C-alpha cells in the first residue's frame, strides 16, 4: 500500500480513514472504498491479501438478570418530598412519559419508595 502521496491528519491502518479516523466499510465490488463520514477514498486494490474475520457471540440462555419490581424504571431516578396517599410515607421516586400528544404536557408517575404504590399527575 502506497500512501506516500496522501496528505492525511494521521497515519492509520486500512481499517480506519486516515483523514477523520472513522472505520472504513469493507471493500465491495466498487473500485474504491469511500469513508461514509468525510468522503475520503482509497483504491480497493490496497486491500488485497487483507484477511477479515468476524464472529458473533451469543449470551447463554438464562444469564440475563431477571427483572424484579425494584429494577424497573419507576423505582429508579430522583426521589422527591411527596407524601404517598396510601401509606403516608414521605418520599416518592418519579419518572416522566409523554403519554398524550406532543403539544400537551408530560405525565409524571410517582412511586412510593415504601409500599410501591403508584400515582400519576398530568403536568
Swiss-Prot record:
Q: Which Pfam families match?
A: Zn_ribbon_TFIIS
Q: Which InterPro entries match?
A: DNA-dir_RNA_pol-M_15_CS (IPR019761), Rpa12/Rpb9/Rpc10/TFS (IPR012164), Zn_ribbon_RPA12_C (IPR034004), Znf_TFIIS (IPR001222)
Ligand binding (Zn(2+) 1): 17, 20, 35, 38
The protein's UniProt keywords, in alphabetical order, are:
DNA-directed RNA polymerase, Metal-binding, Nucleus, Transcription, Zinc, Zinc-finger
Q: Where in the cell is it found?
A: Nucleus, Nucleolus
Return the motif ranges for Hairpin. 103-104
UniProt: Zn(2+) 2 binding residues: 84, 87, 112, 115
* Zn finger spans (TFIIS-type): 80-120
One annotated Gene Ontology cellular component of this protein: RNA polymerase I complex
By what name is this protein known?
A: DNA-directed RNA polymerase I subunit RPA12
Which species does this protein come from? Bos taurus
Species lineage: Eukaryota, Metazoa, Chordata, Craniata, Vertebrata
